[in-house]
Every structure is written in C-alpha cells, then in structure tokens.
UniProtKB/Swiss-Prot annotation:
It is an enzyme of class 2 (transferase). Acetyl-CoA carboxylase is a heterohexamer composed of biotin carboxyl carrier protein (AccB), biotin carboxylase (AccC) and two subunits each of ACCase subunit alpha (AccA) and ACCase subunit beta (AccD). This is Acetyl-coenzyme A carboxylase carboxyl transferase subunit alpha. Belongs to the AccA family. The gene is accA. PROSITE patterns: COA_CT_CTER. The keyword Membrane does not apply. Component of the acetyl coenzyme A carboxylase (ACC) complex. First, biotin carboxylase catalyzes the carboxylation of biotin on its carrier protein (BCCP) and then the CO(2) group is transferred by the carboxyltransferase to acetyl-CoA to form malonyl-CoA. It comes from Rubrobacter xylanophilus (strain DSM 9941 / JCM 11954 / NBRC 16129 / PRD-1). Keywords: ATP-binding, Cytoplasm, Fatty acid biosynthesis, Fatty acid metabolism, Lipid biosynthesis, Lipid metabolism, Nucleotide-binding, Transferase. The keyword Cytoplasm applies. GO terms for molecular function: acetyl-CoA carboxylase activity; ATP binding; carboxyl- or carbamoyltransferase activity. Its EC number is 2.1.3.15. GO terms for cellular component: acetyl-CoA carboxylase complex. Pathway: Lipid metabolism; malonyl-CoA biosynthesis; malonyl-CoA from acetyl-CoA: step 1/1.
Amino acid sequence: MLDFERPIKELEERIAELHRLAGESEGLQAEISRLEEALEAARRRIYTNLSPYQRVQVARHPERPNFRAYRDALCEDFYELSGDRHYGDDAAVRGGFARIRGRNVVLIGHDKGADVKSRVEGNFGMAHPEGYRKVKRLYGLAARFGLPVVTLVDTPGAFAGRGAEERGQAWAISEDLMALAAVPVPVVSVIIGEGGSGGALAMCLADYLGMLENSYLSVIAPEACASIIFRDSSRAPEAAEALKLTARDLKEHGVVDEVLPEPLGGAHRDPEAAIRAVGEALERVLAGVSGSSPEDLLKRRYARYRRIGSYQRLPGPSSG
C-alpha cells in the first residue's frame, strides 16, 4: 500500500468488516452504502490530484500489470527468441514473434517478473548489455521480415553494475538507438510503468509513443536526482516536479503522442481495463501505419525527433 492510499485502505477495511457483520445484523446496509460512496469519492479525490512523485510510486507498484500480463492477454500467439548471439540471454528483456489482434508483429518488453524468483531472475527489469543486444537482434529480424515492432517499456533503467559496464552497456544501448532510427518498419511503443533513462530509451525511439497516465519517463530517477542536485534524497518529490516526467508533461512537450487512461486507482486496481486500453491503442495505431512505405516512415521519424527539443521565445517583462 502506498502512503497516500491509506485513507482508501482504511475505508476498504471498514467496508469489508461491515460486510462480514451484515449477516448478523440487517441494519448495516445503509452504513455500507454510505462508506462505499465515501470510498469512491476518496479514490476520485486522491487519484485526480496525484503529484508527479506519487505517479512515480504508482508506476512502481508491485501489483501493476507487467509485460507478462500484457503478453498473455493481448497475444494470440507468441514465439519467444532468446540470446544475443554474443554472450548469453537476459531475462530482463523478452521478445519474439507475436500476433496481436490478428496482426503479426515483433513484440519486445522489459520483464520485471511476477514473483520473487522471476523478479530476481529478471533483475527487476534492469537489463544487461546482452539484453540490449538481443533487442537489436529482434529489430533486425523485424526489418528482415517486414514486421512492425511493438515495445512495452517498464524499467527503472539499464543495470549499472561493473560487469554490465565491462560488457559495453552504453555501447549496446547506443546500437539499439541507431537500429531504431533506421529500421524500415513501423515502431510502436507504450510505456506501461517505469521509463528509466537510457534503459527505456533503447526501446521507445518510436513512430508512436504512448504512455499510461501513471507511468513516467525520465533521464534519472527522482531519488537519484535529489541526491545529486540537492544532496538529499528525501527531496525526491521536488525533483520529480522539476523533471517533468509524467505522461501529461511529456505530451505537452511533444515527446509523447498519447496519454492512455488508467482505471481509477491505477492499473493495479483493474489490470484488465489497463491492458484493454493498451490493446485498443496498439490495434488503432498499427492499423494507421500499416500502409506506410519505408521511405515515408523514415522521413516522418526523422522529422518527429527533429521537432523534440524545439523552443519558443516568450516576450520579456515590460519596461513600463
């Protein structure tokens, strides 16, 4: 339970207790109805006024649907491919040939795992160089077979351990970016949770970038930013505000194409609704780009990223 969800949790527990007692007393239904209305109002009040850092906390929620949940719900078929053909495999990133709502694609995603064992195996979604080299290999296969690339991004960032650095972490990510910039097929990306730094960027340099409304995309985690800038990690909420890392901030700045709605209370409250929203977006976007020629795709992709980072001059303070 997140700290700001405590009032919601208390109401839920009170309602559950009254439901338990309702069999013994018939005079509790009115109180249950009143508390259920209060619960709905509390959810709406809290979740329509989340701060940027609270959205980061929601994006990290352990019960939030992960890559496996989306894969299992959206894919009619999925044939996983493993290994980078250089060093080994990396369970933090999974990908392969898939069929999503009748359309053949190459599906790639960060895998945070579903239980303790799989989370440790997948390093909590923090990929090593071999993971990013596997991703590049999958981009190449998509180009060879003319299949759209679909990526589901959910990572705190690329793993920064000594072994990863020795095996060329930064190089592997840069190779992914180069491959994505030039791959002659549609690239559709959705950030479903965390979008941490280069580890996320290696999979979201796309023709379409969507974000679930409580996901984030940032060059650095708020806690790390606060430690560096303020010398105080407890100022993470302040750092999150300054980083402009929320889906709505990034949509406003032209980085993100669409903010996908989550159920009230976050994706972890109703995973099926969140997965359905992502599935509908993927179906719509893939249908829209399916007829594009490689030349048009690359031209639009280039123009898209040239626009990001542009600025406008604002009038200065009046001299009067």
